[in-house]
Amino acid sequence: MRKYGFGIDIGGTTIKMGLFKVDGTLLEKWEVDTRKEENGKSILDDIAKEIKDKLEEKDIHKNDVVGVGIGVPGPVSGDGTVLKCVNLGWGVFNVEETLSEMIDLPVKAGNDANVAALGEMWQGGGKGYKNVVMVTLGTGVGGGIIIDGNIISGTNGAGGEIGHIKVIKNETETCGCGKTGCLEQYASATGVVKESKKLLSIDDSPSILREINVITAKTIFDAAKDGDKLANKLVEDLGEKLGSALATISCICDPEVFVIGGGVSKAGMVLVNVIRKYYIEKAFHACEETKFELAKLGNDAGIYGGVRLVLNI
């Protein structure tokens, strides 16, 4: 019986790696820099070297390894083909076949947000559930949809791109994707800050935020907890947009639980309770009791999800 597996989370600045037992026990984690020079051609070389070195260091034979699972910051088709990965400089190629040939081990790949959602379902905030939607509120808004324990990636690997649900009809500013009115423009860490600056410029009511040199999502939520009316308006607006988007998703896939993660989620239940309030207001009545949980694995969700990709469970 194979005893070990590797989980890999490729980010724009670092590649996170984990060696696991097949029961989900994390034995060791580490990271290396993401070398994006020359269209990221060194990335898989570095991953292959790290895996080979770790096997030698731990005296683990390849026959004892179930495989390697990878989260990639871009769409990945069902056969392991990266369709485009701007952050890494990658064009279209099959990452599973390429890395598998380099290390002589089975490889499975998926979009990083989907893979992180799989990790949270397995060992994190979604543990015990089979139908999970994860929303990651960071620099952008990512998402992952898990139904019956399986990632829903869709035809083009774009399933779960929650951040690009349209929530504002007449927005003039453009989202990073090139469209307008996307959830990511308002619910990401950068989006919340941008919205705060807009509100401060048109609403002259007193606010702690006016005294802060560098406004962040954290300072906004801290001010809201302290009773700042303008900050609370920002949190309510954020909660309404997220709640509305999740209500739409619930009509399509009817999850058991929404798992909220990413840096913005550090606001904790203050944020979750506002999202839930607007979710219940907007959701189809049969879906109103969907649970909300905070993510628990933090930056390790990607490596947990990676190894879960290659486990036959």
Functional labels for PLM-detected ranges:
Residues 1-66, 76-79, 97-107, 119-129, ...:
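ATP-binding/phosphotransfer module of carbohydrate and carboxylate kinases, centering on a glycine-rich
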Residues 105, 130-135, 139-143, 147, ...:
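Generic beta-strand structural signal
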Residues 109-111:
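Short loop/edge segments at beta-strand edges and connector loops
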Residues 158-162:
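Structural signature of FAD isoalloxazine-binding scaffolds in flavoprotein oxidoreductases
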